[in-house]
Amino acid sequence: MVRPLNCIVAVSQNMGIGKNGDLPWPLLRNEFKYFQRMTTTSSVEGKQNLVIMGRKTWFSIPEKNRPLKDRINIVLSRELKEPPQGAHFLAKSLDDALKLIEQPELASKVDMVWVVGGSSVYQEAMNQPGHLRLFVTRIMQEFESDTFFPEIDLEKYKLLPEYPGVLSEIQEEKGIKYKFEVYEKKD
């Protein structure tokens, strides 16, 4: 069974997603809660969601928050020989991680699969065949960044007018406006 893949990301107007291993903007508490709710909430009793992230994204999470709780954490790295402390699994690539998820020990435990960064992992996910959703928080301001989100090809991805559990009106925190968007691609 090929399950849909979900990417979740917050991007500034200049498509920035990171700066010096952190977010380019101040912590937006409600945006962070949205990330937690979306990636944690499982629709299937007894199953957990799974998050996939690159090594740099893993180490950008404060140690006290690793692993992301109530979720199965897979870290991608071609260099590491074993999962970093706290991570549940290590895979060499997104393809390897997706194969791992379909192994019997995990297949029965996993509900939704979320890619949570960084750039190259998002790029790899967006190039996957099949059903893909992008949950994009548009931060409606430019922030200096050194890490960016790949271009969303609107020939392939459709912006959905609404999505269950996702607010459609513009949000504001700390003087920063943002909005939640959901894109979908079906091959």
Swiss-Prot record:
Enzyme class: oxidoreductase
PROSITE patterns according to UniProt: DHFR_1, DHFR_2
Cellular-component GO terms for this entry: cytoplasm; mitochondrion; nucleus
Major subcellular location class: mitochondrion
Binding-site residues for NADP(+), renumbered to this chain: 10, 16-22, 55-57, 77-79, 117-124
Catalytic activity: (6S)-5,6,7,8-tetrahydrofolate + NADP(+) = 7,8-dihydrofolate + NADPH + H(+)
Residues of the DHFR domain: 4-185
Localization: Mitochondrion; Cytoplasm
Entry binding sites for substrate: 31-36, 71
Record PTM N6-acetyllysine, positions in chain: 33
EC number: 1.5.1.3
Residue numbers of N6-succinyllysine PTMs: 33
Pathway in which this enzyme or protein is active: Cofactor biosynthesis; tetrahydrofolate biosynthesis; 5,6,7,8-tetrahydrofolate from 7,8-dihydrofolate: step 1/1
Annotated function: Key enzyme in folate metabolism. Contributes to the de novo mitochondrial thymidylate biosynthesis pathway. Catalyzes an essential reaction for de novo glycine and purine synthesis, and for DNA precursor synthesis. Binds its own mRNA.
Protein name as it appears in the record: Dihydrofolate reductase
Encoding gene per record: Dhfr
